[in-house]
């Protein structure tokens, strides 16, 4: 069963009341259904695979992985050779990152489910200790797996492009948003 990012009329109404331009976009675009990956390890793999490649390439590779592995778990990833993982279209470096993360999880060196008990900053700090994971990947995991609503990834190119289009700015700065508890809902249509 496909799961989607959870938000409702309350969040949309709040945003529309706070920002005229955003209200116009929400009225024009309508309800956005954005898939989430509730399995944290699968979401981690998804995030690593999607780094610095086109959306189309990411979707193609992700479909291959899902078709072959079914449920994506550390055990299933470790059971494959590097070459088998690369055949999905994953680069050697990303395969290394994914397998190292799977190994750390299986060895108990990294408690992926413990992330739920951490603040956003702590999640970023913990995930950034894994090879190949930085702030962007951690933010994507918090947003599209953990469904944390107060995430706005300023470094995400799609979000920057969307903000530029809505607000007609050349440069997007990382200034506080007056309705921070709803940041994720602002950008769902941009991703």
What are the residue ranges of the model-derived segments?
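Alpha-helical scaffolds flanking conserved acidic
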Residues: 9, 39-43, 79, 123-124
């Amino acid at each position: 069963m496909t799961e989607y990012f959870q938000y409702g009329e309350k969040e949309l109404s709040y945003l529309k009341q706070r920002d005229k331009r955003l209200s116009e976009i929400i009225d024009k675009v309508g309800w956005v259904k954005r898939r989430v990956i509730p399995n944290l390890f699968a979401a981690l793999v998804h995030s690593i695979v999607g780094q610095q490649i086109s959306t189309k390439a990411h979707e193609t590779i992700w479909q291959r992985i899902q078709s072959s592995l079914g449920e994506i778990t550390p055990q299933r990833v470790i059971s494959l050779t590097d070459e088998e993982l690369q055949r999905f279209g994953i680069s050697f470096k990303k395969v290394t990152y994914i397998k190292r993360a799977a190994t750390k999880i299986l060895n108990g060196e990294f408690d992926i489910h413990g992330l739920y008990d951490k603040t956003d900053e702590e999640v970023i700090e913990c995930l950034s200790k894994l090879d190949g994971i930085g702030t962007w990947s951690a933010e994507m995991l918090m947003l599209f797996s953990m469904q944390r609503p107060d995430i706005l990834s300023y470094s995400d190119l799609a979000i920057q492009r969307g903000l530029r289009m809505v607000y007609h700015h050349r440069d997007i700065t990382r200034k506080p948003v007056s309705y921070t508890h709803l940041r994720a809902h602002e950008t769902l249509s941009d991703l």
